């Protein structure tokens, strides 16, 4: 099986020093609307995909060019995935706080490796 990429947006608290759990169990201290964006790559597995890499887009404050913000970089990478790959369609999976952030991403990876639309795989964006 090929590797699986999952995009994400989250309002969880960012823990940049914690390599095992980059986002915690609480809301971002800056408020529920303070979002961070990124992507995670998994080694595909039909039962439990394995997280290989996690990239958090930089949180660029006071940047007038939206494409240079974390949200802008996220949207551009997702647009490219939809425009130039077999994954033309995208599903947004909203996951709550009842599991870890990594657990939510892993659930998204399971969906990304199994869902198809018109015989083609789909992109998955996890919001947790």
What name fits each language-model region?
Residues 1-125:
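Flexible, membrane-associating and regulatory peripheral segments of lipid-active enzymes
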């Amino acid at each position: 099986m090929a590797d699986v990429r999952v995009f994400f947006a989250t309002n969880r608290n960012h823990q940049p020093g914690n390599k095992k759990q980059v986002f915690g169990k609480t809301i971002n201290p800056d408020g529920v609307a303070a979002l961070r964006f990124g992507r995670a790559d998994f080694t595909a597995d039909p039962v439990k995909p394995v997280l290989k890499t996690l990239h958090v887009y930089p949180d660029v404050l006071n940047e007038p060019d939206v494409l240079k913000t974390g949200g802008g970089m996220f949207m551009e990478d997702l647009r490219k995935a939809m425009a130039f790959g077999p994954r033309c369609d995208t599903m947004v999976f909203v996951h709550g706080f009842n599991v870890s952030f990594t657990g939510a991403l892993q659930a998204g990876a399971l969906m990304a490796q199994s869902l198809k639309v018109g015989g083609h795989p789909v992109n998955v964006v996890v919001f947790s």
